[in-house]
Amino acid sequence: MKTRDEKITVSDGLERLPEPALKSDERKMARQKIYALLEDRDATLTFEEDDPLEQTMVLNMGPQHPATHGVLRVVLKLDGERVVHAVPELGYLHRAMEKLAENKSYHEFMPYTDRLDYMSPYSNNTALCLAVEKLAEIEVPERATYIRTIACELARISSHLLSIGALVMDTGALSVFLWTFQEREKIYDIFDLLTGARFTISHCRVGGIASDLSKECAELIIRWLKQFKPKIQEWRKLLDRNRIFIERLEGVGVISKEDAIAIGLSGPNLRASGVHYDIRRDEPYLAYNDLDFEIPTFENGDSYARYQMRMLEMEESVKIIEQALRKLPKGEVRNEDAKKTFPWKDEIYHSMESLIHDFMMTDSGIQMPKGEIYHAIEAPKGELGFYIQSRGEGVPWRLKIRSPSFCNLQALPKLVEGGMIADVVIIIGSLDPVMGEADK
């Protein structure tokens, strides 16, 4: 056995390995000697200069990798299994959304917003409509405002279900992923009944919504909420007591309150670091000012806190939907100003005036006033904002999208550097990015 002051090289003992012709007993003794050297805690291991273990390695993770949650490429510099440096590379799903908006009327651009955060398309529709309505000073009927609120919270639950299910699957468990997808399918059935489409819905309209909330749809939502609430508690009992799940997330990907603000995090990722900020409460829009709900926050700023945030937000979304259904007012669901909104589709087939009105709106679009506006909402991923610059035409001169996933991914290098390569997958899942929204 080597003394404390003596050094052992990796090649020490290896260079005296027996030749293949040696007996098995001699070969066994040589192996035991090497094992004894490696188990000596007082010995100091040194490596030769050309040893590959002394060199850092660059690893490409993605863009075609199931753990990156989309076409995200992360270039990792590794020292063994520890991440020394990380560079996220975006743009693989870039479709020039902002440039396309400059050649589309505000109504024509609505379906494009569905393809931003395609996990919660209703939130994207709502954000664009609110920005346009704010610039054009269009009043939206109160019933339409409440229906938008209900649909946005359903979209939030749907998005968080996917996020939690995928995160748990990243840790090696598949069951929760299947359970969350079962509930998402039920939400899609609700959207199908409400909007006529399950996924890319384009239900919002400037000045209101495309169709009213039927009694049948409202009853379906109530029945689903009743059976969904206990399931959240079941999942929390299962995951919050699972030692493997907790150890994979707790203390992994920690970011402080100050760093989260400096980088520009928003949504659950920001509140998980202790920042008590939610646009629904701090800058109320839709019907949130009339509803009672809590804004959960955590101080740890790690992956486990981000998971907890989304679990608690689903519970609050259930409360919001229940209140909105109870308070749902009667009345119209769309502004009837002929210069700012489209006519109803069923009127076009029977009225020449409505047909001409629809043709003019399709050809010229809404004649917006000159000016600029920025409006943001609390989307499931964070602050989703639309900046519109108008020259008084039917199309925007400039439309800028503030996507939360793009801003949240800026924190990725800080979160993964110094951690293990196995934790990179967990950290990306806890951030919950959507690349369609990040790349635009």
Curated annotation (Swiss-Prot):
Organism domain of life: Bacteria
Enzyme Commission code: 7.1.1.-
Localization annotation: Cell inner membrane
Family annotation (Gene3D superfamilies): Cytochrome-c3 Hydrogenase, chain B
Bilayer-spanning residue ranges: none
Keywords for the protein's UniProt record, in alphabetical order: Cell inner membrane, Cell membrane, Membrane, NAD, Quinone, Translocase, Transport
Enzyme class (EC, first level): translocase
Membrane topology summary: Peripheral membrane protein
Cellular component aspect of the GO annotation: plasma membrane
GO molecular function, one term: quinone binding
Reactions catalysed: a quinone + NADH + 5 H(+)(in) = a quinol + NAD(+) + 4 H(+)(out)
UniProt similarity note: Belongs to the complex I 49 kDa subunit family.
HAMAP family cross-referenced by the UniProt entry: NDH1_NuoD
Function: NDH-1 shuttles electrons from NADH, via FMN and iron-sulfur (Fe-S) centers, to quinones in the respiratory chain. The immediate electron acceptor for the enzyme in this species is believed to be a menaquinone. Couples the redox reaction to proton translocation (for every two electrons transferred, four hydrogen ions are translocated across the cytoplasmic membrane), and thus conserves the redox energy in a proton gradient.
Family matches, as PANTHER family: NADH DEHYDROGENASE [UBIQUINONE] IRON-SULFUR PROTEIN 2, MITOCHONDRIAL, NADH-UBIQUINONE OXIDOREDUCTASE 49 KDA SUBUNIT
NCBIfam families: NuoD (TIGR01962), PRK06075.1 (NF004739)
Protein name: NADH-quinone oxidoreductase subunit D 1
Native species: Chloroherpeton thalassium (strain ATCC 35110 / GB-78)
Gene: nuoD1
